[in-house]
Curated annotation (Swiss-Prot):
PTM description: Contains 7 disulfide bonds.
InterPro entries named among the record's database cross-references: Bifun_inhib/LTP/seed_sf, Bifunc_inhib/LTP/seed_store, Glia_glutenin
Name the UniProt record assigns to this protein: Avenin-like a2
Keywords carried by this UniProt record: Disulfide bond, Seed storage protein, Signal, Storage protein
Organism: Triticum aestivum (Wheat)
Pfam family, any one: Gliadin
Transmembrane segments: none
Family: Belongs to the prolamin family.
């Protein structure tokens, strides 16, 4: 009798745990088999991409040795590695971030204003990125970093793209599609 009671209690506990796991997984609060997405890449990596594009791509180098000696190779790695680790959707926001950084830096140089290292100030309207900057970033980053950028990035203004790069959620993959 005691053995039957223990087996019944064990079965009930296991069933409750599975039901609880399924409930929390299906509600999005937990994960069945947690597979973390790469962490959101903060602004400094996007600054590295912008600096690389401005210093290494827009400036012609005659010899590849100069390119290597200038630190461009390291900057390229620091730019491409985070891009390869984020989702395609988040890469669209990354392209916008790089384009906006370049635009702000060019405006600062043109008007003698200090460069902003972080994003726009709260409440400040986001300016539209000039087409030539966006085109240069879209033509360079995907091939240079061997990553895909969604097609809609070429036609959607940056001001309408949500900052997906800063809000990458954890995903759950469950056996049998239970989640």
């Amino acid at each position: 009798m005691k053995t039957m009671f223990l087996l019944a209690l064990l079965a009930f506990t296991a069933t409750s745990a599975v039901a609880q796991l399924y409930t929390t997984c299906s509600q999005g609060y937990g994960q069945c088999q947690q597979q973390p997405q790469p962490q959101p890449q903060p602004q400094p990596q996007m600054n590295t991409c912008a600096a690389f594009l401005q210093q290494c791509i827009q400036t012609p180098y005659v010899q590849s040795q100069m390119w290597q000696a200038s630190g461009c190779q390291l900057m390229r790695q620091q730019c491409c590695q985070p891009l390869a680790q984020i989702s395609e959707q988040a890469r669209c926001q990354a392209v916008c971030s790089v384009s906006q950084i370049i635009m702000r830096q060019q405006q600062g140089q043109r008007f003698g204003q200090p460069q902003q290292q972080q994003g726009q100030s709260f409440g400040q309207p986001q300016q539209q990125v000039p087409v030539e900057i966006m085109r240069m970033v879209l033509q360079t980053l995907p091939s240079m970093c061997s990553v895909n950028i969604p097609q809609y990035c070429t036609t959607t203004p940056c001001s309408t793209i949500t900052p997906a790069i800063y809000s990458i959620p954890m995903t759950a993959t469950c056996a049998g599609g239970a989640c």
